[in-house]
Curated annotation (Swiss-Prot):
Extracellular compartment spans: 30-241
Residues annotated as domain Ig-like V-type: 35-127
Intrachain S-S bonds: C53-C115, C160-C219
Protein name: Junctional adhesion molecule C
Transmembrane segments: 242-262
Subcellular location: Cell membrane; Cell junction; Cell junction, Desmosome; Cell junction, Tight junction
UniProt remark on domains: The Ig-like V-type domain mediates interaction with JAM2.
Organism: Mus musculus (Mouse)
Sugar-modified residues: N104, N192
Membrane topology value: Single-pass type I membrane protein
Oligomeric form and interacting partners: Interacts with ITGAM. Interacts with GORASP2.
Signal sequence coordinates: 1-29
Amino acid sequence: MALSRRLRLRLYARLPDFFLLLLFRGCMIEAVNLKSSNRNPVVHEFESVELSCIITDSQTSDPRIEWKKIQDGQTTYVYFDNKIQGDLAGRTDVFGKTSLRIWNVTRSDSAIYRCEVVALNDRKEVDEITIELIVQVKPVTPVCRIPAAVPVGKTATLQCQESEGYPRPHYSWYRNDVPLPTDSRANPRFQNSSFHVNSETGTLVFNAVHKDDSGQYYCIASNDAGAARCEGQDMEVYDLNIAGIIGGVLVVLIVLAVITMGICCAYRRGCFISSKQDGESYKSPGKHDGVNYIRTSEEGDFRHKSSFVI
């Protein structure tokens, strides 16, 4: 008898918890709730993507649905008043009552999208969910800068750059269609070379080029959306002709010496001295000084007589 009495007391003590649980479940059922099958979709440019927004619980048969786009700190409408808005108009439709499907996505569609549902007949009338869309862009043809010729033992830098791909591409270099390792020391095949490849910046740096480094080089830029390569370009590694350089310098010095000697000889012979007029030079009078000059036929010379000016 005492045992059954204790059991009844325990049941009575648990009744409030039971009623609270029922009340809580009732409130949950009467509150609108959303979920998404993929809150971080990733898609390649020019493909289609679905932005999933699913109502799991609601007592409202016709809730109000809105979609907004958040990009660079600005919020704009995507779906409002049962119409697609903004730059997504014409390539977006609504499916499953609350989800969006975007056709022919572009890189400008990368943003955070917010699905908002207003259910006026529910205790909790509003719920929202955010979805981050990432659009990956295939790289375009990279720009490669490759020196045409480099002397043996000198440093050389090959550059590869691409600016359109997203996420940022990684770079790899090829010589005669053979991929180059990041570090030449890591592969015995390139033991005669001394280079390093930076896959982030696209540079290929030779510390000291060797004859075996001659060949055709090209670069490939790649990311998750695809890859692109530049046209192959030849790089020649040549030996320095020391004897030829010395001979050329000697020839220049000899030519300069011959020219100098020729100038000196010409100067000694008076080729650079201006000839003077024969006889005595005279200076023409600058102004009339009051003296008349009379030439006599007997003397054949100039004589003067004084004249007085009154």
